[in-house]
């Protein structure tokens, strides 16, 4: 068992080089509407780097523990002042597994809330890809709030914060005096639950910080 630091070295974003590229589809289990991302990543990416890529692409804030489960082996980390990894994920790259097309593995985020992600290798190619890597090429659904409590509680909260309840809240605004400060806070709260759109451009802006 080894111990190392978290993400530090930049990923190679030079699109002129021809190197193995993996196309991954990441799906968050147990939520509806579906939350998923399709990513292009260099096969030489380490497990530690993939953790950061998935956090940025999905929209998580990296506030909790995580674990990868690949072919029955677990790779994860813990916080102790700074983020640290165990089982060598900061040096072990995906190429070492020789992942095949259509092969799957799992990514677990937050051991209390249990956000489980299914990761599927859709394609493996050695052809040149234009643009920086890693990159999100498709996706749908906004990531749940960090403190939503897991898929079941999140789905229950969506029912509480549905469109009907939102209209009732609008009616209460019409009936009473409005404090602008409180209104802004409450409106932001409703947007968290009602706006389920995925902003791919914003996700790629976050991912570009890893390629520098």
Feature map (PLM): residue ranges:
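Short linear regulatory motifs enriched in tryptophan with gly/pro/ser
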Residues: 1-212
């Amino acid at each position: 068992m080894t111990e190392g630091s978290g993400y530090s070295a930049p990923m190679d974003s030079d699109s002129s080089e021809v190197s193995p590229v993996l196309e991954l589809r990441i799906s968050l289990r147990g939520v509806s509407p579906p939350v998923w991302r399709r990513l292009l990543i260099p096969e030489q990416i380490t497990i530690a780097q993939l953790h950061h890529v998935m956090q940025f692409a999905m929209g998580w804030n990296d506030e909790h523990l995580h674990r990868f489960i690949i072919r029955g082996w677990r790779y994860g980390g813990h916080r102790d002042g700074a983020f640290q990894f165990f089982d060598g994920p900061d040096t072990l790259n995906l190429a070492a597994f020789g992942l095949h097309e259509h092969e799957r593995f799992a990514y677990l985020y937050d051991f209390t809330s249990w956000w489980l992600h299914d990761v599927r290798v859709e394609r493996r190619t050695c052809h040149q890809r234009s643009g920086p890597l890693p990159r999100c090429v498709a996706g749908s659904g906004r990531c749940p709030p960090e403190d939503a409590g897991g898929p079941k509680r999140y789905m229950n909260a969506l029912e509480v914060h549905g469109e009907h309840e939102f209209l009732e809240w609008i009616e209460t605004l019409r009936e009473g005096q409005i404090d602008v400060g409180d209104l802004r806070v409450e409106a932001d709260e409703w947007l968290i639950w009602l706006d389920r759109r995925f902003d791919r451009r914003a996700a790629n802006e976050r991912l570009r910080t890893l390629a520098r």
